[in-house]
UniProtKB/Swiss-Prot annotation:
One of its GO terms (molecular function) is ATP binding. This is Nucleotide-binding protein lhv_0732. Displays ATPase and GTPase activities. Keywords: ATP-binding, GTP-binding, Nucleotide-binding. It comes from Lactobacillus helveticus (strain DPC 4571). HAMAP family: RapZ_like.
Amino acid sequence: MADDKKQLLIVTGMSGAGKTVVAHDLEDMGYFVVDNLPPTLLGSFWDYNSNDFHKVAVVIDLRVKTFYTDLLDEVNSLEDNGNVQATILFLDASDDVLVARYKETRRLPPLANNGKGRLLDGIQEERRILMPIKNRSNYIINTSNLSTKDLKQKLINTFSDRKRQPFSIEVMSFGFKYGMPIDADIVMDVRFLPNPFYIPELRPFTGLDKRVFDYVMNKKETQVFYQKLLDLLETAIPGYIKEGKEKLTIAIGCTGGQHRSVSIAQQLARDLSKKYPVDITHREVSRYIRK
């Protein structure tokens, strides 16, 4: 979507096709979202609010049978304003999928004749009324076979000005006695490994010191554990990426966050950086730097 014009995205379509889900996704993408705006108020809303937000999305659904003429009139009027790019996104789904969704939620479509008519009749009448809007739409997304994750990615690919952020990893060392990091996705406890704390000449230093690092990493039990950890992560990380994860935080903890966790985190960051962007944080190291 053009960057030199303010962006107005109009989200409409079949009831039950996912407008509420899309509204939440657009908010995550930085849009200011207004739900259930009557079509006749679209122009007035834009006049009063266009200067406050660069990206605006309005969700409009079927309320009256003049819906499509009102909406098209408002869109045509807005397009006469050279400072706005009005885009219509139409959400659709097959009749059988919509019927199944309505039965699951125990709700009725707007044109179901107050519950007296057949569910499918209401859906088909709504589809007929919305056809002019569908034909006028810039984008049509059929959600019949889309998971919520797939739908969000399709929205990002189509409407986000940042697209999808590249996947990255943060490796963090920490000390359990200072509390676990609350933002970690994976936490590994390495307190079972040999502890340099009990080696007097190593005690004052951290895992950033080569002597401490070599002591920890050259132990057989460390090498066995580390290889299994690396194998696990190399198996799991592609799955996180597939699920849409943009940043994965891996926390390695020992008692004080000074020796073992720092050493393991250093090696892990080094190995993972061969495939992925990696940042490393040693949460407790500043506690042990001699001043």
